[in-house]
Regions:
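Glycine-rich phosphate-binding loops of nucleotide-dependent enzymes
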Residues: 1-151
């Protein structure tokens, strides 16, 4: 139930939850995200950090969003779960879903982004393109300098 909260309008019919449709949607979403759980009814709090993060992403993917804002999507999770989340982000971007990723891990930002916008004190202090990143003209020091710039 927890995994389908964000998409209730898709599984409620005449005021009642369509349980079979809900379970099928959650099952498919969990399979796409490679969530490892004994059953769909397992409490999310009992799962590993990586699987908890994947459940949260699966929940929002059920809504079929046009834009996803991911704040520290891989903080504190194992390498395997990070890979799954990165893979999901690439697949979503290929489908035309815009992803705004907020991360304090600069190598992650540089590796995953088509464009990087550095924000400091509510203002954009630097913008970098994928071409600049790939050409090596953008370094972690450039990003940090932009972040520490006086606005």
């Amino acid at each position: 139930e927890n995994a389908s909260l964000a998409s209730l309008e898709r599984i409620i019919y005449k005021g009642y939850t369509h349980t079979a449709k809900e379970k099928q949607s959650v099952k498919e979403s969990f399979e796409k995200m490679h969530v490892k759980t004994p059953t769909l009814d397992t409490a999310i709090s009992t799962l590993s950090g990586g699987n908890q993060q994947k459940v949260l992403l699966a929940r929002w993917l059920l809504c079929e969003p046009d834009i996803m804002i991911l704040d520290e999507p891989t903080r504190g999770i194992d390498v395997g779960a990070k890979f799954e989340i990165y893979k999901m982000m690439v697949e979503l971007a290929k489908k035309g879903i815009a992803i705004i990723m907020i991360s304090s891990e600069l190598p992650e930002v540089m590796g995953m982004s088509d464009r990087i916008m550095v924000v400091s004190k509510g203002r954009i202090t630097g913008t970098y393109t994928k071409d600049e990143i790939d050409a090596g003209s953008v370094t972690q020091n450039n990003l940090l300098s932009s972040a520490l710039q006086e606005v």
